[in-house]
């Protein structure tokens, strides 16, 4: 079975990015999923689309939340991935 993957759009020296990632990692104890971290500044098309919202948590190309971890939205999304 393929593990679900969530993507965190991040950038260097971003304290909100670090906080969102740390909070998200706590969910890996309850849900089995991978976290992919992508630096938006290395991908011009991502920076153009998402740069003002970083950090952004995505499921595929669908936004779950940005700036801060939205606990309710993450719980709902991860519950559907089971």
Stretches found by the model and what they are:
Residues 1-26:
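Local sequence-structure signature of Cys/Sec-based thiol-disulfide redox active-site neighborhoods
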Residues 7, 36, 64:
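Short, flexible active-site loop motifs that bind/organize anionic cofactors or intermediates
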Residues 28-32:
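Short helix-capping segments at alpha-helix termini
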Residues 33-44:
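Thiol-based oxidoreductase modules, predominantly thioredoxin-like and allied folds used
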Residues 42-55:
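Short Fe-S-cluster ligation motifs
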Residues 54-63:
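A short, hydrophobic beta-strand/beta-hairpin element that forms part of a small beta-sheet core
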Residues 68-73:
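N-terminal, polar/charged subdomain of small-to-medium soluble alpha/beta proteins
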Residues 78-82:
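Ser/Thr/Gly-rich flexible loops in soluble cytosolic domains mediating phosphotransfer, phosphorylation
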């Amino acid at each position: 079975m393929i593990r679900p993957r969530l993507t965190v759009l991040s950038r260097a020296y971003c304290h909100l990015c670090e906080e969102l990632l740390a909070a998200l990692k706590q969910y890996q104890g309850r849900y089995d999923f991978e976290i992919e971290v992508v630096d938006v500044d290395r991908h011009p098309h991502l920076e153009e689309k998402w740069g003002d919202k970083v950090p952004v948590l995505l499921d595929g190309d669908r936004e779950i939340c940005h700036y801060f971890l939205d606990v309710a939205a993450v719980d709902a999304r991860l519950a559907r991935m089971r």
